[in-house]
Structure formats: structure tokens, C-alpha cells
């Protein structure tokens, strides 16, 4: 299923990602997270493991311009937004918001968590706009020693009307 969105006179869509997107996802990781790009095996895992919501944003030419993965942990009662990124030239068009919203909509659990570099205020603002609250920090989480801010959202309204199990 492709969801097309009209934003700032640009068209982009959101659809499921799969292993065929590995090359484009590697490039997106390299560009978006030069200090923290996921290794190849982790990318293969996120594109193939069961229980992962994986969505890509595509431009008018079908090129992958954004990606999000949500790790649904049913037995633990929550999900993690494992990664989300949008190529720099496409930022500010609502693509990150669209990816996050679409991923959350496919997660049928009441709690969603994520972590973000404490030195990434733009991403932190996005998550706060979506109702994520600061829960703590993980010191030295990133390879360069940077801290991760752990954030959490309780999807109370969604859970109440959808009847999540």
C-alpha cells in the first residue's frame, strides 16, 4: 500500500520497505548518521526480522528518501522506534512526521519508546510534538561517547478507541 502525500508542491509516498531497499537504506544511514550508521548486518536484520514495522518514504522518482523501523515487542508490551531518517535535501517537508505517524499507526501496543542523540535538538522537538516524554539518558550509548535521550509515548487515546490486545 502506498500513501501519497502532497507537501510543499512535492509528492512523496510511504510504503513498506524490504530487502530490495538494502542499498538505498545503507546510503541513507551513511548520509543521515555519519557517526552512527548501522552496520550491514543490522540493516539486513531490520529489513527481514519478523515483528518489525519497516516503512520507506519515496520521492516522485521512486527513490528512497526516508525510512523508519519500529521493533514491536509484544511480550514486553511496548515497541521501539529503532531508527528514523530523512535525506537532508528532503527535510522540512513533513516526511519525518509522516513516517513516524505511519509507523505508530501500525504498532498495536500502548507504549512506544525511542532513543535519540542528546545533541540532536531537531529530532527531539519532533518527538516532543508527537507526545514523547523524556524518560532518562544512556551515557556513552553512541560509539563517539555521546549520550542517548530515552523518550516514551503512551498511546492512551489510540489504545482506548482501537481496543489493543
Predicted regions: what they are:
Residues 2-3, 7-12, 16-91, 97-106, ...:
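Acetyl-CoA-dependent GNAT
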Amino acid at each position: 500500500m502506498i500513501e501519497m502525500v502532497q507537501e510543499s508542491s512535492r509528492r512523496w509516498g510511504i510504503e513498506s520497505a524490504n530487502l530490495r531497499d538494502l542499498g538505498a537504506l545503507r546510503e541513507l544511514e551513511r548520509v543521515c548518521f555519519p557517526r552512527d550508521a548501522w552496520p550491514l548486518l543490522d540493516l539486513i536484520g531490520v529489513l527481514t526480522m519478523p515483528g518489525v514495522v519497516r516503512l520507506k518514504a519515496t520521492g516522485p522518482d521512486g527513490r528512497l528518501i526516508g525510512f523508519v523501523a519500529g521493533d514491536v515487542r509484544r511480550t514486553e508490551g511496548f515497541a521501539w522506534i529503532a531508527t528514523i531518517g530523512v535525506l537532508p535535501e528532503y527535510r522540512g517537508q513533513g516526511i519525518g512526521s509522516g513516517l513516524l505517524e505511519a509507523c505508530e499507526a501500525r504498532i498495536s501496543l500502548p507504549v512506544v519508546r525511542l532513543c535519540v542523540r542528546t545533541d540532536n535538538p531537531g529530532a527531539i522537538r519532533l518527538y516532543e510534538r508527537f507526545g514523547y516524554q523524556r524518560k532518562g539518558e544512556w551515557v556513552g550509548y553512541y560509539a563517539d561517547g555521546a549520550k542517548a535521550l530515552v523518550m516514551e509515548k503512551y498511546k492512551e487515546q489510540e489504545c482506548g478507541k482501537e481496543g489493543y490486545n
